[in-house]
């Protein structure tokens, strides 16, 4: 859930800026696709933090997928950016993605490195980032292999109605790999819309839109739209 990053790219203009939030989402995916997503989580808890410093910024999030009886999985992305120049909105971006599932073992881990172009409007009401990254998937269990990939990422955040509403999200495009070793384009986007009741508490929704991302053994369907209903607390 990289949405949080877009809302705090503006902090790169200041030193030692930091912010953190926690989100709780009820997921309707299993209701919409009872066969294809029969094992999908109902609830996801997310912790995110962004911190800017003299060299650039740190960012991470942790997703916990929950059921009534257990934690189904934990997934994290942690990234570091090093500013190229104070006069240029460019940064060197390095990242690690991975996690563990209680039923499936580890997620396929990946390391990423590349360049990021970050920007914001003069009033800081809109922020954006475009990243072009080399991506290396590692062999995580018996049924997959290590391979090289390329990822293009866009991240955005917009405040409007006097900061009462926030629209943020990301979209990723990368080369995935089928079981037969052939490549495929994977698309994943998670836009969020929040109504900010106070400076700390928000209610809203996230919609996970994907193609060739969800592992489906029931049929040949590859495109899914999974909405949530969520609450967020900004520390």
Question: Where do the PLM segments sit?
Answer:
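Bacterial Sec-dependent N-terminal signal peptides
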Residues: 1-21
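Short glycine/proline- and aromatic-enriched beta-strand/turn motifs that initiate or cap beta-hairpins
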Residues: 18-67
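Repeated loop/turn-to-beta-strand initiation elements of outer-membrane beta-barrel proteins
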Residues: 22, 55-59, 86-92, 121-128, ...
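Transmembrane beta-barrel strands of outer-membrane/channel proteins
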Residues: 24-28, 60-64, 94-96, 128-134, ...
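Solvent-exposed loop/turn segments connecting transmembrane beta-strands
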Residues: 39-41, 65-74, 100-109, 138-149, ...
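Membrane-embedded beta-strands of outer-membrane beta-barrel proteins
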Residues: 47, 76-78, 113-115, 152-156, ...
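Outer-membrane beta-barrel transmembrane domain signature
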Residues: 135-202, 208-213, 233-235
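Outer-membrane beta-barrel "beta-signal"
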Residues: 223-235
